[in-house]
Every structure is written in C-alpha cells, then in structure tokens.
C-alpha cells in the first residue's frame, strides 16, 4: 500500500501536477530558504510577489547580509510576523561570515540555523542537495491522515511523530525533492482542506477516508487556539508636516519596528494616561497641543 502510494504520487506529479511557483524546481539553497521563510504563515499568492522582490534586491546571501536591517524590514513590510524577517537577516549574516556565503549542505547544520525548524531544513536538504528527508507540513499531514484513515491529532506530540515517521517511510529516497514537492502540491491542489477533488484523485481507491466517508472529518486537531484581545491607544503627534515615531523596544514580535506613541490598556475603556501626557509634553516642549480622538477600529 505504501509503495503503491509513492508510485502513484510520482506518476501524478509527472503527468498532472501543473502548479506553478517561481521557486519550484529551484536548486539554489539560498532561494529555497528564502521562499520557505516567506511562506511561513503566508499564502503562496501573497508570498510570490515578496519572493521576487527579495531575489531582485538581494541576489545572494552576501547581498542580504550586508543590507541594513531597516532596508530589509522595509522590503518585508506587509508580510507580518517580523520575527521571521529578523531571523532571516541574522542567519544571512551568520552564513556570510561563518560559511563565506555558502549555504551548509548537511541537514543538522541547516537545522541549527536561526529560524529554521525540521520542515524548512528538510525542504532545503531535499530540494537543494537531494538528501532523503521528508517534509511534513499541513498539506502532507492532511494527505496522510485521509489516505491511511488516521485520527491521531496532527498537532499532538504523538501525532507529529507519527506523521513524520510515516512520511519518511513513504519517501522516494532516490528523488526526495520531487517526492516532497509532489506531496505538498497534491495536498494543496487535490486533497484540499475544503472541497477536496476526490473525483479526480489518483489515490481514492485506497484512500480510507474516501472509502469510509471520513474526508470531512480528517485530519483531527487537538488544540483550539484561544484568541486574545489587546487594546492599544496610539497617539499621533503632528507638528507641521512632521509626525513623531519611535523605534519599539522590548523583545516581542514588533521589536525594532517604528511606531507612534502607544499605550496598551487592560480593557477597551481606555483613557489618556498621565505618563503618556508627560511623554508628549517632553516631545513638543512648550508648544500648545491638543488631543483629538478618532473612532476605534478592530484589527484581527
């Protein structure tokens, strides 16, 4: 069953996988790494444009490493999750200095780099260096869960290990990069989270979820993410044509980004804080100022 799955997948990839992406088939580890970091928490359609912008602006790791942090952050603007960008820049500097700009070709060395986890390390190792390491992302987990009829939660420790071992056992060790790309593309275009194309699926005869009517029930997730509400009040200080901004301190996801004066309150009944008024007075000096409020808005 496992061998047949792999054979059919590779056959589908060669004949029917028409998914096009600018990094697909790439063997340059720098470009593969860049694409994988951009695609973390980002849809392919959005990441495509940013990938091309980064490659055009920073053709090599040395180019990225030499760039000022503000320049890199500006190019990243709009993607969110700026920790990815910070790690990307830090790792580029490390590779430029430690490896003289040559991306490490050993899986464990790749995995040790800042901002790179098992999935990204496996992607780089298999796509760039043809090393036999299976990638396991949400697409892969979904395909495996449905095909084998597995109801172990994909986000549980035992589930993560189970899907990793299963993916490794299916891996075509002669062409791991092709297998990995095929698995991800199959999950993204055929075995989709919603409205999967079971009617054209080459695996449906052996797919346990299809045969037993479990498709909409798999995969299973253990955790339900709890949304946290935060209330921010921003103070936009204008003087003529100038606007005051400052670099954010601290170690949160927005560290080193620029912002207006910010006060975070415990509830939405926010009010002007005395310390904030003093801060504004320090900025504007003896000049007269007034505070005008605007309607609140929700950001999710």
Which ranges hold each PLM region?
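Catalytic cores of DNA base-excision repair glycosylases
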Residues: 2-199, 203-217, 229, 287-289
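A short glycine-/small-residue-rich loop at the edge of a beta-strand within enzyme catalytic domains
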Residues: 192, 226, 267-271
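N-terminal strand-loop-strand
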Residues: 216-263
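Short, Lys/Arg-enriched, disordered terminal segments
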Residues: 1-7, 268-273
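The catalytic Nudix box helix
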Residues: 256-298
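Structured beta->alpha junctions
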Residues: 27, 43, 128, 249-250, ...
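Short, solvent-exposed loop/turn elements at beta->coil junctions and helix N-caps
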Residues: 221-224, 294-300
């Amino acid at each position: 069953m496992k061998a047949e799955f792999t054979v059919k997948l590779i056959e589908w990839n060669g004949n029917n996988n028409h998914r096009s992406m600018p990094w697909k088939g790439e063997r340059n580890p720098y470009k593969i790494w860049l694409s994988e970091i951009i695609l973390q928490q980002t849809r392919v359609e959005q990441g495509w444009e940013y990938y091309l912008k980064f490659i055009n602006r920073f053709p090599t790791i040395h180019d990225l490493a030499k760039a000022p942090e503000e320049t890199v952050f500006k190019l990243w603007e709009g993607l969110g999750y700026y920790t990815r960008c910070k790690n990307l820049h830090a790792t580029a500097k490390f590779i430029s200095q430690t490896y003289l700009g040559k991306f490490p070709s050993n899986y464990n060395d790749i995995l040790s780099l800042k901002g790179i986890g098992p999935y990204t390390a496996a992607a780089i190792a298999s796509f760039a260096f043809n090393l036999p390491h299976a990638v396991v992302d949400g697409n892969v987990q979904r395909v495996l869960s449905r095909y084998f009829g597995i109801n172990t939660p994909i986000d549980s420790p035992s589930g993560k290990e189970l899907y990793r071992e299963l993916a490794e056992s299916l891996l075509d060790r002669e062409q791991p990069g092709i297998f990995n790309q095929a698995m991800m593309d199959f999950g993204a275009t055929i075995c989709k989270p919603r409205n999967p194309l079971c009617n054209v699926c080459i695996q449906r005869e052996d797919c346990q979820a299809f045969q037993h009517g479990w498709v909409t029930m798999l995969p299973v997730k253990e955790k339900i993410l709890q949304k946290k509400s935060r209330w921010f009040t921003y103070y936009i200080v204008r003087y003529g044509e100038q606007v005051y901004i400052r670099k954010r301190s601290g170690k949160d996801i927005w560290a080193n980004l620029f912002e207006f004066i910010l006060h975070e309150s415990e509830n939405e009944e926010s009010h002007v804080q005395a310390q904030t008024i003093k801060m504004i007075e320090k900025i504007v000096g003896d000049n007269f100022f007034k505070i005008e409020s605007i309607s609140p808005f929700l950001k999710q």
